[in-house]
């Protein structure tokens, strides 16, 4: 497989870096798109290219990973260039809630265009796979770290809201498999962590990993929203997220087994994610 090249967009992000590593571990060559190739610090053997060079970067690749934030407003042009280059396969990452009403997708407030990018890939006329992860465990950093700088309490509403957050490495490894394995073509693959956890249960799990007696304190939604906004979160995002928590509070959380069935190992737990990122909370 030494001559097989894979092109990764969004290559320096939360998913991009572990995806590059996962592909390298399979012995294939990787071409990685990043806005700052000279500062990307990829492992040896990775060819870093700027977005402006995407036309030439597409030549000769076996498959292309389309990151929704990297593609975004340029998706149609990227699809045109991929078709022009005869790219044999596209793998796109969207989200598990991509079919929900757009007003019910909090990440859109931060600029995500999962629905539009996934649709452009599916409509491109090229073979495709769509990977639809649930919320990343990594999101807890942005949600809780500000509060935990000043104490051991996470204050928030809807402590009974549960979801099966996913480790970014599981997402990256699933995408790598989709790039490498043609048996997944034409599938929309929803992936989650191994178990649904309530917010008020996740906080003490994090505490056990970092050696602190953390706990969750229920507060009214209005008070929580004000605190989240003070900690730097976008106001529209906060209100859309809390509306989602309220709307889904009493619904069974979605838990899939696709990670285990496709990759052959169980999805990593939230406790594992916390241990892997313990230093980020210092």
Residue locations for each model-derived region?
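Basic/polar N-terminal segments that are highly enriched at the extreme N-terminus
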Residues: 1-5, 279-282
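Oxidoreductase cofactor-interface core, primarily capturing Rossmann-like NAD(P)-dependent enzymes
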Residues: 2-43, 59-62, 68-89, 96-215, ...
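Rossmann-fold cofactor-recognition segment
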Residues: 44-54
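Short, acidic/turn-prone active-site loops that include or flank metal/cofactor-
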Residues: 52-54, 95-97, 159, 243
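Residue-level recognition of oxygen-bearing side chains
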Residues: 53-56, 272
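A hydrophobic C-terminal alpha-helical subdomain
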Residues: 222-282
């Amino acid at each position: 497989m030494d001559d097989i090249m894979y092109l990764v967009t969004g290559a320096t992000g939360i998913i991009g870096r572990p995806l590059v590593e996962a592909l390298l571990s399979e012995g294939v060559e990787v071409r990685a798109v990043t806005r700052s190739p000279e500062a990307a610090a990829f492992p040896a053997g990775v060819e870093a290219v700027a977005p402006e060079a995407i036309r030439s970067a597409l030549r000769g690749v076996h498959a292309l990973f389309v990151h929704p934030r990297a593609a975004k407003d340029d998706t149609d042009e990227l699809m045109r260039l991929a078709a022009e280059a005869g790219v044999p396969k596209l793998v796109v990452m969207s989200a598990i809630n991509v079919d929900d009403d757009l007003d019910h997708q909090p990440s859109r407030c931060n600029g995500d265009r999962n629905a539009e990018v996934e649709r452009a890939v599916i409509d491109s006329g090229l073979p495709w796979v769509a990977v639809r992860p649930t919320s990343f465990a990594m999101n807890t950093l942005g949600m809780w770290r500000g509060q935990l700088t000043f104490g051991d309490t996470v204050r928030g509403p809807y402590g009974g809201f549960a979801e099966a957050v996913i480790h970014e490495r599981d997402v990256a490894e699933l995408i790598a498999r989709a790039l490498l394995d043609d048996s997944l073509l034409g599938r929309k693959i929803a992936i989650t962590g191994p178990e649904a956890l309530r917010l008020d249960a996740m906080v003490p799990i994090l505490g056990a990993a970092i050696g602190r007696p953390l706990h969750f304190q229920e507060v009214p939604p209005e008070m929580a929203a004000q605190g989240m906004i003070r900690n730097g979160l976008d106001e529209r995002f906060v209100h859309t997220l809390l509306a989602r928590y309220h709307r889904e509070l009493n619904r069974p959380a979605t838990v899939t087994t696709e990670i285990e069935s496709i990759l052959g190992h169980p999805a990593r737990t939230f406790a594992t994610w916390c241990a892997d990122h313990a230093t980020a909370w210092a």
